[in-house]
Amino acid sequence: MLRVHELDKKMSGEDRFHLENISFHLPKGYICGLVGENGAGKTTLLRCLMGLYRSTGDIVIDGHNLNSDEAAAREVIAVVGDEGFFDENINLEKLGKYYGQMYVRFDMEKYLGYLERFNLDRKQKYKKLSKGMKIKAQLAFALSYGAKLFLFDEPTAGLDKHFREDFLRLCTELVSDGGKSIIISSHITEDLDRIADYIAYMQAGRLLFFKPKDAACGHFRIVTGPVYKCKLIPREAVVYMEEGTYSSTAMVIRDKCILVDRELQEHTPDIRELIHYLVKGGKENAENIVEKYFG
């Protein structure tokens, strides 16, 4: 579905941000969670994938190279985010008629059908919609021209739990036919824990790893117990340990640490814990620790 090879983008301006040598492959039918701290380069990467920023390297979407076959590539990309790209002052029906002309395979009947399915009034002006309703309207439009790659930038930020549940269900439905893929950039890692198949972790403009979520998280264990017990864990197994007054918590390499002590409790890290301890273990530079443990 999506192949990115040696993508490189140098931004102008005071910060001169550099998106450096990004390569990964997201197969059809899968969801990727894009994570990293603010300023890591997530939005810049998404804008390169959208074609909003020109970059060197190759971006191939459903067989179409974004640099050499941009028109065909854009036909299969859907951008769903906080701001949107639609005229705020027209209603949803007119929105479909106007913007649908830009896509060869746009189907107005499908679009109206999705509006009905998402409980959206076709006569409602776009600017009158809530953030959650705007996301549904954008999805309805994208599904109506046959988009294959869906790019979401912080789609559930600031939204209530009910909409988040609805959104996660929609995402799993989107990829269920095996023909579509999704990249979600989000700080709400508990959402990604539930639906992401892959994790892409960025830091300072570099993609430090792109791994299947279960494999990445399953490579480690979070261990909690009395301070003196945790200190007995072999040093070569410890990625990072946080010591408290009476108890400590550490992330350890699963294959290098077999625990039999009942005073030590363990669980598989979630995405938030994984990133937290990788960063801490790398002394605020996760690149070293990632290369050490993931190769």
Which ranges hold each PLM region?
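A short, flexible loop at the N-terminus of ABC-type nucleotide-binding domains that lies
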Residues: M1-N21, K28, E70
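The feature captures the beta-strand-to-loop junction immediately N-terminal to the Walker
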Residues: V35-E37
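Helix-to-loop junction immediately C-terminal to a conserved catalytic motif
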Residues: M50
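Conserved ABC transporter NBD signature motif
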Residues: G57-S68, A72-A73
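ABC-family P-loop ATPase nucleotide-binding domains
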Residues: E75, G81-Q138
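Catalytic Walker B motif of ABC-type/P-loop ATPase nucleotide-binding domains
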Residues: F150-E154
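Short loop immediately C-terminal to the Walker-B catalytic DE motif
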Residues: T156-A157, T189
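ABC transporter nucleotide-binding domain
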Residues: L168-V252
